Amino acid sequence: MATVDRWLLPDGIEEVLPPEAARIETARRRVLDLFQRWGYELVITPHVEFLESLLSGSGQDLDLKTFKVIDPLSGRQMGLRADITPQVARVDAHTLRREGPSRLCYAGSVLHAKPRALATSRSPIQLGAELYGDSSTSSDIEVISLMLEMLELAMVPDVHMDLGHVGIYRGLARAAGLSGEAEQRLFDAMQRKAMDEIAELTATVEPSLAAMLQALARLCGGRETLDAARRVLAEAPAPVTEALEALIRIADQLALRYPDLPLYFDLGELRGYHYHTGVVFAVFVPGVGQSIAQGGRYDDIGADFGRARPATGFSTDLKTLVSLGKAELDSRLSGIWAPYGDDTALWQQISRLRREGERVVQALDGQNGETAATAGCDRQLILQDETWTVAPLAS
């Protein structure tokens, strides 16, 4: 590599400089404090793990996103984490092994071999919360509410939420007796809302079930969508109607708690179908082509670690949250400029001010170029009546 190119970073990999780094760190602390007030405990997971652990229960998409390396000590394949969620599931299932609900949260950098979308970062800062050990809709409502509180704290404007439930499609597909290949082809057609293809793929299915499957792709819109789904799926198998009623309970509670939040329902949108097992949700804002926060239920994710547990949670990219949010994250520097010197009294005053929480920058011996202004200081230490005193900078 030529010397002139040594500063280049790979596509989608960026560094965060001051003052933006200070804004992101302020936001991280505020959000983690919010999670703590809701009872969520912070966990810190490693950047690299053995691949089979890192990809447990996650499906092919995460495999394609994961950078892979060989551990020189064991010879086993390892992965650089592309998603923290499976790691937290391992912590809950294998390390903590708690009985009853467990609330965990996290914040850390992840690395993607492929970007989520064109011109997006491959090194987001993933932040999220997970609730393990409860299969009721109350836990889904809690994590969705926490996600919305996080967005409100960040002052992200004009949010709207998409809600769905993969159990509705899964229940119909199983009742129809579709093979794995046929179910996958139908799933692909559902995502494209290819009505002719959906009709062709369900031509050999029992007519009432075929009609329900074909209707799913058209069941999208506002709250009226759920009323229409109740009519269309009235004779559906029990797992389907139970999934629909769970979705309705969640939607009703969210409407009560957040009456101004626009809710959109698409029963044919199967985001995370191979990973999630119940409700799925995502938050969007105008002008951004992908969700800014997303999550859902993924029961039994801990099975690969020897302890299956119901689970629900959400995640977001902290850098995206900060860039979209309007919250005041003051990154302007202030501080006290201290002159260079070996005076013990000066050192004691500097130490005292730092212990009190002040930012103090001391000049270096013979330095050139740095001044109180370039160091971000708005005050200075001056010797006055043989005492080191904080004073405004001379104008």
UniProtKB/Swiss-Prot annotation:
The keyword Ribonucleoprotein does not apply. Pathway: Amino-acid biosynthesis; L-histidine biosynthesis; L-histidine from 5-phospho-alpha-D-ribose 1-diphosphate: step 1/9. GO terms for cellular component: cytoplasm. It comes from the Bacteria. Belongs to the class-II aminoacyl-tRNA synthetase family. HisZ subfamily. NCBIfam families: hisZ_biosyn_reg, PRK12292.1-1, PRK12292.1-4, PRK12421.1. This is ATP phosphoribosyltransferase regulatory subunit. It comes from Stutzerimonas stutzeri (Pseudomonas stutzeri). The gene is hisZ.
